[in-house]
Amino acid sequence: MRILHTSDWHFGRSLHGQDLGDARALFGRWLIDTVKTQNIQLVLISGDVYDRAIPPVGQINEVMNLLEELSSITHVLLTSGNHDSAARLGMYSHFLRGNIQVCTRVEDIGTAREYLGTGDDPGVLVYPIPYLEPDLVRSVLSPNDQPLERSHQAVMDAAMRRIGDDLKRRRSEGDLRPAVVMAHAFIVGAAPSDSERNIEVGGVPSVSAETFENFGGDPQAPTPGLSYVALGHLHRPQVIPSSQVPIRYSGSPIAYSFSEAPGDKSAVIIDTHPEDEKLMPHAQRVEISGISMPLALSTVDIPSAHPLVVLTGSMDSLLGKAAQVDRESYVSLTVTDDARPQSMVSRLRAAYPHALSIIHAPAHTPLLAAPQCDLATMDIRSTLADFFSQQGGQPVSAEENSVIDQVVSKVKEDLQ
């Protein structure tokens, strides 16, 4: 069976105020085309299809239309993330085709979704875990009357023990199909970017990778165990290192922060019954103990409507580089001149039509001693002039002093 793993669509999110509708449309077309050309039989979406719990109507329609089109050509399994509203997302399952399953209920953790292969392909077992907010689920997942510890580790351990119990039963009955877990969490060893919302609770924001290997510390973990863990939450595509089980973040399909520059995006393709002649050229075979047929993992690049470019330098150097940058790129510029250049923003926007962030950060900022002053006798005009002089790296001009006088006079007038 050939599976595509994606996550963190965040439909409705912008980048420095820039609407990303064209990027969303490009991703949607790419996803449909990839499912068709790569013969994808199951799409896993590991949380955060929306950026907000109550998304705008336009983004609801975009996601629903894309899911409807996907469901006409393949199976889709979707879980909720920390940005989604699990309750609202769960309601959509009543309006979608039978090929789509939306998994948001904590009570359903440990129930495998079974997908059958064709021919001698046995198919796959998928265990979806929606985003687990410790305060909301530590009583539900507790095996007794006492709530679990208030941490992501504790609730994920409990979820994995439920999955382990079901998988042990299946293994004892001779079911050796590959087993995949979907989760939305921050795993130890992963590298975050600036665009993820902090999910720290009780000082323990992360989950150990060993949780997926030993099923939450179960001394009698099922054998064979998991074949793959399809993660969501972090926006950079990455592999969790030193794990016995393949654990991957697909990353978001669209870049939502300049910390993700250059913004290269991808999805993961999992072949649970790989045939050499059908594998992608760079596919990686993964041997899973107890499963006769190795998995094959590969990535497929997602096109970008607007590559991200981050540039730092003097005003002259930045203006000189403009011709080398694709005019469709979204650009972050940091100007390092000691003095703020005249008309800095307007000149840079003329050179870079999609400059979304322009910052003046002098390369040589003098260290200033803490001022000693008498607040009662301090002159507001001279204080403001001193401040702007220090920040701009040069004395204020007569024109700027005139603006300061006007502002101070207006404020005093309004306060009378």
Identify the residue ranges that each predicted region occupies:
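N-terminal active-site segment of His-dependent metallophosphoesterases
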Residues: 1-72, 406-410, 414-415
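Conserved beta-strand elements of the Class I
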Residues: 4, 125-127, 266-268, 309, ...
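Divalent metal-coordination and catalytic microenvironments
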Residues: 8, 28, 48, 63, ...
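Accessory, non-catalytic peripheral segments of nucleic-acid enzymes
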Residues: 37, 272-416
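Short, surface-exposed connector motifs at secondary-structure boundaries
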Residues: 70-78, 327-330
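A conserved active-site cap/scaffold subdomain adjacent to cofactor or substrate pockets
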Residues: 216-217, 223, 228-302
